[in-house]
Curated annotation (Swiss-Prot):
This is Large ribosomal subunit protein uL14c. One of its GO terms (biological process) is translation. It is found in: Plastid, Chloroplast. Keywords: Chloroplast, Plastid, Ribonucleoprotein, Ribosomal protein, RNA-binding, rRNA-binding.
Amino acid sequence: MIQSQTHLNVADNSGARELMCIRIIGTSNRRYAHIGDVIVAVIKEAAPNSPLERSEVIRAVIVRTCKELKRDNGMIIRYDDNAAVVIDQEGNPKGTRIFGAIARELRQLNFTKIVSLAPEVL
């Protein structure tokens, strides 16, 4: 579960390395965000010579959480870290590569570009 002030790893090559969640998009008073939710985040750590800079406010979609994800067939998926992919206003990823596995639920939420770039979809 991701809430305000949660630090996340970045799962793409956009130039950001660590994010901090500021807000969850789509509702006024929701406390937690899960896989597939869009958040507003600030960059806490960035790679040198990257187009994204530290303290820049961006949008990101959550692709991995430490909290379990229960599917309808009874399968439970849990990842080792909290990770997000930086996106633009249209929902397209800013990076050209995705690192690590992502959940199949992103395809149902119309993040097909992220799913196609991912090396493994669970």
